[in-house]
Structures are given as C-alpha cells and as structure tokens.
C-alpha cells in the first residue's frame, strides 16, 4: 500500500507539473535552478548548514545578475512550455520567467538572516535597494516593484507584497528587534558598512 501511495503521489505531482504527465524538468544536462525551492528549503529549516552554503553558492553562480537587479527567479530554461502554468508563456526576464522577482528575493534574504547568513542576506536586500534607487535604470518612484526586468527596470509596484517582507526583515532580522516567548529580544545582524547609516533614538527619561 505504501508503494501504491507513493506511485499515486508521483502521478499527481507529474500532472501538476505538466498537463501531459511528461515531467521533463531535469531531463537535459543544462543547469537549471529556481529560487523558490531554495527559499522554502532554507526558511522551513529543512536545509542543513552545508546545503544552505551550497544554495548560496549556486544562487550566486546561476541566478545573481547585478544588471537585472539581483537574484532572478530562475535560470533560462530556453524553451516554451505552455502546459507548465504561465511561467514559460513569458519571455525570459519577464515576470515569473526569470525576472528579479522582488517578493521571492526578499523572502530569500529573510531565510538567510534567520539561519545566520547575514552577509548573504544583506547582499540580496542591498542589491534590490540599489537597483530601485537607480532611477535612470529602474524608471520608477522610490519603492519595491513586483519585478525588475533584464535591464533593471522596475515594473508593477502595486502588485507585490515585497515591501512588507522587506520591512519585516529589516526590523526583526537586520535590526533584530523581535518578541520571543513574551520577552523582547534585540539581536542585530548589521554589516559594518551599515553602521554609518543607522541612528538610535531614545526617549528622554
């Protein structure tokens, strides 16, 4: 019965991947990587420390594109596959097909900070900020767009929840102010270069 259940689950997975139950995601030898799977593996605590380090190295090697604005959602699969959701209906670098998708990028940063990888998390957040604030390139008001395209242009700022995740990460992970079992914990994870840009306000006693 276990074998049957496993087989049935596999068939369901394949149907979700492809309407034709033809799972070819890893059929070719070309390197293919998607950020989403890495993020949830780290954020859920499933990935080991060794695996997290490998994820960071691979993401830097295959997904990071400074010109585009940071970490792309996936590598270029170089195919049109219209039975795999809407992802491959877009040209590479647009929306879900390989754009720098701000929401997932910020969640990646959050996951890295939570697991003690502040340097790597800082790189994610800072690249997004630098791209958004480069108005000649981003061509948008200050803020976080849904995604940056191949040229680093910010698009659809009203469609994303990335800003709330960015603020959450800055407050609870970068500045390290969070609650824990009824206590307030302050455990900042600031990089040395951030100290010159931080101010501490205290109320008069």
Regions from the PLM with identified roles:
Residues 2-9, 13, 201-205:
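Single conserved hydrophobic/aromatic residue that forms the stacking wall/gate
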Residues 5, 101-105:
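N-terminal alpha-helical segment
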Residues 61-66, 78, 89-97, 107-203:
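Non-catalytic C-terminal accessory modules of carbohydrate-active enzymes
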Residues 10-100, 126-129, 133-148:
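Extended glycan-interaction surfaces of carbohydrate-active proteins
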Residues 37-38, 104-108:
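A general alpha-helix detector
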């Amino acid at each position: 019965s276990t074998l049957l259940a496993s087989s049935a689950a596999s068939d369901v997975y394949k149907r979700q991947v492809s309407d034709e139950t033809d799972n070819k995601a890893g059929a070719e030898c070309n390197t293919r990587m998607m950020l989403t799977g890495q993020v949830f593996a780290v954020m859920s605590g499933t990935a080991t420390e060794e695996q997290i380090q490998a994820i960071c190295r691979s993401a830097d090697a295959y997904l990071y594109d400074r010109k585009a604005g940071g970490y792309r959602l996936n590598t270029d699969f170089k195919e049109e596959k219209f039975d795999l959701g809407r992802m491959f209906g877009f040209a590479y670098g647009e929306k879900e097909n390989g754009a720098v998708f701000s929401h997932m990028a910020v969640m990646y940063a959050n996951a890295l900070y939570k697991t003690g990888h502040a340097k790597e998390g800082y790189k994610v957040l800072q690249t997004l900020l630098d791209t958004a604030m480069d108005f000649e390139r981003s061509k948008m008001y200050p803020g976080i767009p849904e995604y940056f395209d191949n040229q680093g242009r910010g698009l659809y700022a009203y469609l994303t929840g990335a800003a709330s995740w960015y603020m959450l990460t800055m407050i609870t992970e970068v500045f390290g102010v969070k609650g824990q079992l009824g206590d307030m914990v302050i455990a900042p994870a600031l990089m040395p270069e951030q100290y010159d840009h931080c101010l501490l306000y205290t109320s008069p006693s």
